[in-house]
């Protein structure tokens, strides 16, 4: 609980007001869609790491929990892109690779 955690840190003068939450969502790693995504990512970006769980406030639950569809997120940026920082950026090279990756994945999945 966030309120308990903040209090434990010694901040008694902080008020936490919850206006809403994002439901958790998870696609099983044995989904048949993972292999084409992994293959395309390897071909376009080279070596990469798969994170079976990733904290995110992306609305994946709409796809997984409501529509019953799998979701797989692939980052186009590199470790120096400072995600969600004021100076967040994406190189032109990674933008082009990301576009290629998306097109490749869509093609591979359409042929399944």
Regions picked out by a protein language model, each given a short descriptive name:
Residues 1-5:
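Short amphipathic alpha-helices in soluble, non-transmembrane regions
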Residues 9-112:
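An extended, acidic, His-containing surface patch that forms the Zn2+-binding/catalytic region
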């Amino acid at each position: 609980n966030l309120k308990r955690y903040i209090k434990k840190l010694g901040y008694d003068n902080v008020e936490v007001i919850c206006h809403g939450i994002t439901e958790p969502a998870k696609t099983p790693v044995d989904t048949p869609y993972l292999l084409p995504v992994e293959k395309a990512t390897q071909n376009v970006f080279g070596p990469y790491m798969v994170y079976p769980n990733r904290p995110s406030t992306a609305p994946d639950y709409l796809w997984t929990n409501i529509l019953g569809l799998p979701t797989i997120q692939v980052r186009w940026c590199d470790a120096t892109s400072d995600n969600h920082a004021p100076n967040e950026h994406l190189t032109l090279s990674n933008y082009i690779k990301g576009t290629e990756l998306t097109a490749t994945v869509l093609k591979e999945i359409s042929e399944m």
